[in-house]
Amino acid sequence: MAVAILFFSFALLLAIGVPVAYSLTASALATLIYLGLPPIVVVQQIAAGAGSSSLLAIPLFIFAGEIMLRGGISERLIALASALVGHLRGGLGQVSVVSSLFFGGVSGSAIADVSAIGGAMIPQMVQRGFDRDFAVNVSITAALVALLVPPSHNLILYSAAAGGGLSIADLFAAGMLPALLMTAVLMFTGWMIARRRNYAVEAFPGFSAVFTRLVSALPGLLLVALIFIGIRAGVFTAVESAAIAVVYALLVTILIYRKLKFADFVEACTGAARTTGVIVFVIAASAVFGWLLAYLQVPAAAVDALRSVAENKFAVLGLIVAILLVLGTFMDLAPMILICTPIFLPVAKAYGIDPIHFGVVLILTGGVGLITPPVGSVLFVGTAIGKISVAQTLKTIWPFYLAALAVVILVSFVPAISLWLPAALK
């Protein structure tokens, strides 16, 4: 009965529009009262959940991304991507996808990606003769690439939700090939649509232009290498790398790009504080919810329930992916990671599924929810930027949506895509 109260009250509060963090806390409190447990548990678990030192990396990486965003990196990354792939069919659409790959290494956030890259590319694409729906669709789905490129704070969040025992370096490495695969599949999808709609093809600007723009964008791109190599080599921890990323971002944007002004710095501070506040509130509320899940032995019950349905690990993984896709339609990615990890990770381990691989699958699957109504935060940001209705977007986004689902399925059932690089780097 307690489990029913916990999940039903949470679902009911979400359905009537109560924010996720409040829904988590209220449903947990109602369950505690039903069980006769002291309400002080809520305060204790909130303090424990928000007080983990490993989570310090998240606000610092977000801050570094905000600084780079306002310091001129997005324009340089778009210019580089334009020189590399702008001459392909669907030119600016291809530029949008590759720019998202580059920018994901700076921000690690799908919302930041669609805001920065979509905000720059969608108006340009419409002005250059691309249909508005195509411009919005490619920008929205391209933002999924940013979820897995280091320094993805989603991977750090998953590590924390898994108990903090998973290597951040391995998770960062595991996300790279799936991110590249998603990039390639979305580029191919964009190429097919552009060919069908007969969009114009632009001339290749020449290797000298590629080199010039690479040199201009290189200081920003080196941030990814600095973070990944530093953590991988054991030179510094994830938290230390995040602090170094902030200092590096300030040096690049002030001394090299000379674009960051004091007003931009203030905006970066407030933007990072706003985003961090939301994430930390959800983390704190999820800690209470997660404690109750463990207290009520929900993970063990989930293992038994799935074992009664399927014995094969791939069948179980398929069921989990299907559940995550449904959950992603009405739950944002951060709370989904924090709620689903304690439930499904024990199931994955019981069936011999690697926790690193499962983390990539969880984030990639949850990411599809970001472009799916009714919650779909990336979908709504992209349509707002493109000045197009959600209904109009949904009529034509399905080829990109199916392409993203194909990548989810491929990564889920071919573990080597996510596990090869971490193993090769050891």
Please provide the spans of the model-predicted regions.
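Alpha-helical transmembrane segments of multi-pass membrane transport proteins
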Residues: M1-K426
